[in-house]
Each structure stands twice: as C-alpha cells, then as structure tokens.
C-alpha cells in the first residue's frame, strides 16, 4: 500500500511539472503601442499609448508556440504630440475615454507560422465592443539573457482594424467626400517580455 501511494505521489508530481506554465511579464519601459491613420487623404498622423500592461504564459522557457497572451492599454495615455488632438481623441467622437478607459486583448494565442514568425489571434475590446483580431508577429532574435541575468524576449506585432467596427464613429468629410480621418487604423506593437 505504501509503495502504491509512493508511486501515485511521484506520478502526480511529474504531472504537475509537465503542466507547469512559465509566466512572462510585459516590460512597459521597453514596450510601445503605436498607431497610424490617413488624414484628409494626403498624409498620415501617428501616435502611441504610453501606459500598458500584459503577460504571456508559455509551456516552457524555450518556445512561445501556443503561448497565451493578455494585454491592457490605458486609453487616457494616448499621445499624438498635440494636446488638443489628444483631448479630442479621448472624447465621444473617438474613444470615450472617461466611459471606456481600457482597451484589452484577451483569449489570445500565438501560433507559429514560420521561422521566428507567429499569428496571434484573440479578442480585442475597444470602447466596449469586442471583435476577433489577428496580428502578424515577428520574434526578434530569439530568447536572451540580459546583463542582469533576466530572461527576455522581444516581438513586433502588426495589424489593421476598421475603427467603425469599434464605434469610433467620427465621420467628418471634405466637400469631395474624402474622410478627414480614414477608417483603417494601422497598429504596431513592439513588446519586450521578462520571464518571472
């Protein structure tokens, strides 16, 4: 009986080790979320969100295949380098930041699509609207150990969303019919994560 209990305990321990998750935290000092949108049909305006948080869970420390990803952005941290424009973007014409202060990416999974390349599919919530989204992701130079003995990895993720899908409904147009602000928003995320 004691031998049986010992075997069962060993199997349970092995099982727990096998399913242990490795957790990685976003390093906000080395991460940025940038966006770009066409203005008046003749140029582009870009900006970024400066406050964010996130984490990744992997099956081990050597691969991000099938990793689980969550991300949260503070809408009020929007910065286009023009204060009046930033305030307009926080208004109900765009993000309604007072009512919807967070954007989130949840239930997202990385799937390998090539050497150092992934697809990230998940649920993006902006202004209370949740839609499926897919990012193209490049892993930058694998996994490294920094000079302070921390394990790090870096990624660049990109996608395009239609802002009207998320009720970002500002729709002023020129007399010619060209929108003042285009529908498509290009998003680029440069993210650095540190193993916990």
Language model features: what each stretch is:
Residues 1-23:
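Bacterial Sec-dependent N-terminal signal peptides
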Residues 20-196:
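Low-complexity, acidic/polar, glycine-enriched regions of mature
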């Amino acid at each position: 009986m004691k031998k049986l209990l010992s075997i069962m305990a060993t199997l349970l321990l092995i099982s727990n080790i096998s399913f242990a998750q490795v957790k990685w935290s976003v390093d906000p000092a080395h991460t940025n979320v940038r966006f770009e949108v066409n203005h008046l049909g003749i140029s582009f305006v870009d900006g970024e969100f400066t406050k964010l948080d996130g984490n990744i869970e992997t099956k081990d420390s050597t691969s991000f295949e099938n990793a689980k990803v969550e991300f949260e952005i503070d809408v009020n941290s929007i910065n286009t380098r023009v204060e009046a424009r930033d305030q307009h973007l926080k208004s109900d014409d765009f993000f309604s930041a007072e009512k919807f202060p967070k954007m989130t990416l949840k239930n997202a999974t990385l799937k390998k699509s090539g050497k150092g390349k992934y697809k990230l599919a998940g649920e993006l919530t902006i202004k209370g609207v949740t839609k499926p989204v897919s990012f193209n992701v490049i892993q930058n130079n694998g996994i490294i150990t920094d000079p302070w003995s921390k394990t790090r990895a870096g990624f660049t993720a990109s996608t395009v969303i239609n802002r009207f899908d998320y009720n970002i409904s500002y729709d002023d147009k020129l007399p010619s019919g060209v929108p003042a602000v285009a529908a498509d928003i290009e998003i680029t995320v440069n993210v650095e994560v540190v193993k916990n």
